[in-house]
Amino acid sequence: MEGYRLDPWASAIRLEYEKLFRYFGIKPFQPLLPEVEKAFGKPHRLMRRGIIFGHRDYEKILEAYRSGERIALVTGFMPSGKFHFGHKMVADQIIYYQKLGFEIFVVIADAEAYAVRRLDRRKIIEIGLYEYVANLIALGLEKNKHTHIYFQTNYETPYYRLIQMFSRRVTLEEMSAIYGDLEPSKIMAALTQAADILHPQLDYFGGFKYVVVPVGADQDPHIRLTRDIAARFENELGLRRPASTYHRFQTGLDGNKMSSSRPEYTIFLTDPVDIAVRKLKRALTGGRATVEEQRRLGGEPEKCTVYEFYLYHLIEDDTQLRKIYEDCRGSRLLCGPDKEYAAELLAKFLEEHQRRLERARDRVLEYVEPPKF
């Protein structure tokens, strides 16, 4: 593991996913697909297509679900920029689990955005409400008694007590081994995230002893720390290690990680449709240097950011997706027509989504109470 460390606060990162299995003990998700189908029915497309690629203790979640146990999902968003398709991948998972009957806890990490990203507090709250909560609503998150959205700085007293208690049983040396160089803001953020993940297990919040956390692979340092903390508080508070799943990054249009800090290579769900389409048509593809070469050798959809939009978001039907893949590999689909088709699907999605988003922005306060200052 020497020389290979994950940074959960980096805005751009390249991961070698195989190393996550080898160095950090993450298990492959694909062998669980038959059990997922037995428990939940047809697996989510992100599961079927290998985008959700790894897990910790997910078999315990499947067993608990089959046994009729109550299960909580916990995940969150740092409101530091506009909501893009990488965020949508997390939202899609939240909505999937809501439909399965999981208790849903979504944290808007405003304390972390303020301390680590050093953004203006009022702007953070505005982004949290009208970018993140509003887009969740527009994508289909329902309001019910089993769904809880909260800001880190405006929650219940037992949650804050957890943060204080956790600080007693974690050493600076231990945190440095996980995260590397640290500053007070990151220590606070890590302990707060542990409370975000573990608080549903307290009786005050429902006593959910089975918790699953879907995250990007770069967030595994938080998961490892949280699992260690849970074990240390098993006797005192009855905490259990949370399960987790890991998904691949949404690639930016230049082939690097999609990020709000790189808007020219990122498609936001609030982009005007013509701008989003223009961005997509400039995207890196898996095409060859010339049309003649592509007709001879075929394309490489594995390297194509446009194909990735099909894979992650734009095409639900696996048979249709397979045809596009094979047509690209077999030189029957060239990059120009492919981008035109992807642009049509993207435009249709954004037009419909943005109509829902306008209505959703009027409803955000039904879902969450913002901080008072």
From Swiss-Prot:
GO biological process: one example: tryptophanyl-tRNA aminoacylation
Disulphide linkage map: none
One Pfam family hit: tRNA-synt_1b
GO CC term, one of those recorded: cytoplasm
Major enzyme class: ligase
GO molecular function, one term: ATP binding
Gene3D superfamilies listed in its UniProt record: HUPs, Tyrosyl-Transfer RNA Synthetase
Motif 'HIGH' region mapped to chain: 79-87
Keywords linked to the UniProt accession: Aminoacyl-tRNA synthetase, ATP-binding, Cytoplasm, Ligase, Nucleotide-binding, Protein biosynthesis
Residue ranges of the motif 'KMSKS' region: 257-261
UniProt EC number: 6.1.1.2
Location(s), subcellular: Cytoplasm
InterPro entries for the chain: aa-tRNA-synth_Ic, Rossmann-like_a/b/a_fold, Trp-tRNA-ligase, Tryptophan-tRNA-ligase_arc
Known catalytic reactions: tRNA(Trp) + L-tryptophan + ATP = L-tryptophyl-tRNA(Trp) + AMP + diphosphate + H(+)
Domain of life: Archaea
HAMAP family in alphabetical order: Trp_tRNA_synth_A
Protein name (database record): Tryptophan--tRNA ligase
Organism: Hyperthermus butylicus (strain DSM 5456 / JCM 9403 / PLM1-5)
